[in-house]
Amino acid sequence: MNLKTVTGAAVELSDTAFGREFNEALVHQVVTAYLAGARQGTRAQKTRAEVSGGGKKPWRQKGTGRARAGSTRSPIWVGGGRAFAAKPQDWSQKVNRKMYRGAMQCILAELVRQDRLILVDSITVSAPKTKELISKLAELNAPRALIVTNEVDENLYLAARNIPHVNVLGTNEVDPVSLIAFDKVIMSVDAAKQFEEALA
C-alpha cells in the first residue's frame, strides 16, 4: 500500500497492517473487552444479612394489626439491606493476540479509508508551548487529534497536555479505543513502520 505524507513523500506500507477489510464485529468485541477491562469493579453493597442490627423482631407476630415483620433490616425497610446487592467483580474479558492484532489492523485500515490518518515525517515542538502545537495542528486541519510517535518527545507531550481533545502516545501505548476516539490520527512515518512490523 502506497501512502503519502503531508509533504508529499511516498511511504510504502503493507496491506496486512493498513489495508485490511473492516470487520465490525471483531472491532466491537475487542473495544468492548478493552473498556470492560478498564472497569474497577470494586463497588459493594450489603444484603440484609450483612447490614448491622436487625436481630430483634420489631413487634410480635400477631395482635398488633400491623404487617408482620421479622427484622428491621429487610430490603423494604429504610435502613435495610439491598435485595440484590452488588459485589466486587472482575469485568475483564479474554482477547487472544490474533483477535487484538486483527482489530488493530481493521482500525488502521479504516482510518486510511476515511482519510483520518495523517502521516508526517516527524512532529516536534521547539519548546513545551501549547500555542506552537495548536498552530501546527491547525496547519494539518486536525484540532482534535491523537498524535502517535515512536518515542514520545517531552516537549510535545507537555505542549499537548493542556489542549482538550488532543493526546500524545508512543506506539507501545496505543490501544484500539484511543485510535477510534479522535477525529484524526497524526502518525509519524517511524511509528507507522513500527505498527507495520508489529501487525504484519
UniProtKB/Swiss-Prot annotation:
<comment type="subunit">
    <text>Part of the 50S ribosomal subunit.</text>
</comment>
<protein>
    <recommendedName>
        <fullName>Large ribosomal subunit protein uL4</fullName>
    </recommendedName>
</protein>
<keyword id="KW-0689">Ribosomal protein</keyword>
<feature type="region of interest" description="Disordered">
    <location>
        <begin position="44"/>
        <end position="71"/>
    </location>
</feature>
<keyword id="KW-0699">rRNA-binding</keyword>
<dbReference type="GO" id="GO:0019843">
    <property type="term" value="F:rRNA binding"/>
</dbReference>
<comment type="function">
    <text>Forms part of the polypeptide exit tunnel.</text>
</comment>
<comment type="similarity">
    <text>Belongs to the universal ribosomal protein uL4 family.</text>
</comment>
<dbReference type="GO" id="GO:0005840">
    <property type="term" value="C:ribosome"/>
</dbReference>
<dbReference type="GO" id="GO:1990904">
    <property type="term" value="C:ribonucleoprotein complex"/>
</dbReference>
<keyword id="KW-0694">RNA-binding</keyword>
<keyword id="KW-0687">Ribonucleoprotein</keyword>
<dbReference type="InterPro" id="IPR023574">
    <property type="entry name" value="Ribosomal_uL4_dom_sf"/>
</dbReference>
<dbReference type="InterPro" id="IPR002136">
    <property type="entry name" value="Ribosomal_uL4"/>
</dbReference>
<dbReference type="GO" id="GO:0006412">
    <property type="term" value="P:translation"/>
</dbReference>
<dbReference type="GO" id="GO:0003735">
    <property type="term" value="F:structural constituent of ribosome"/>
</dbReference>
<comment type="function">
    <text>One of the primary rRNA binding proteins, this protein initially binds near the 5'-end of the 23S rRNA. It is important during the early stages of 50S assembly. It makes multiple contacts with different domains of the 23S rRNA in the assembled 50S subunit and ribosome.</text>
</comment>
<dbReference type="InterPro" id="IPR013005">
    <property type="entry name" value="Ribosomal_uL4-like"/>
</dbReference>
<dbReference type="Pfam" id="PF00573">
    <property type="entry name" value="Ribosomal_L4"/>
</dbReference>
